[in-house]
Amino acid sequence: MQCATPLRAQQFEIGLDMPLQFISSTEHNAATAGLVLANDADAHTVTLDNVQRIDLHFPKFTDGRAFSQAFILRRRGFTGDIRAHGDVLIDQLVQMQRSGFSSVVLRDDQNIEHGKKLLSHYKSFYQGDAIHPQPHFAKEAA
C-alpha cells in the first residue's frame, strides 16, 4: 500500500506531545490516500504493517465512532498519522487530539484561527489520554 507523502500543513503546538496539523480539503483530496478505515470497521483487527497514515471519516459531527477507532489504534501502538475528515468542527479538536488524531481536515465553514484560539486554553489535562494513559496525579506521585 502506498501512503501519502508529507503535506504542507499549518502546524501548531497545543501543549501536548503531538502537534495537531490542519490540512486543507484541497491538499487532502490531492494526496495519496492512507488506509481508509470505515466507521463500522473493528480497529482491533486491522493490519497496521507498513501503514503510515489512517483516514477516519466523520459522516456527521454527532457520529463519534472515529474517536474510538483512533483511541484503539494508538493503544495498539500505531505511531503514524491518524487523520480526521468529513463533518469535522473546531469544537471537536481537543477531543480529537486526546483520542489520538494527529491531523484534521476541517469542514469548509470552520475557521482555523478560531480553532487555534480555543485550543490555546488547554495547556494540560488531569486525565490520561490515548498517548499518555497515566493520569496526571499518578505522574506526580511517581
Show where each model-derived region lies.
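Intrinsic disorder/low-complexity detector
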Residues: 1-47, 122, 127
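Glycine-rich beta-to-alpha transition loops that act as phosphate-gripper elements at the mouths
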Residues: 80-89
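Active-site-proximal loop/turn and secondary-structure-junction residues that shape catalytic pockets
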Residues: 60-62, 88-90, 110
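C-terminal helical cap(s) of enzyme catalytic domains, especially alpha/beta-barrels
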Residues: 114-138
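Glycine-rich phosphate-binding active-site loops on the catalytic face of alpha/beta enzymes
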Residues: 101-118
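Glycine/Thr-rich beta-alpha phosphate-binding loop at enzyme active sites
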Residues: 33-75
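Catalytic cores of alpha/beta
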Residues: 44, 90-103
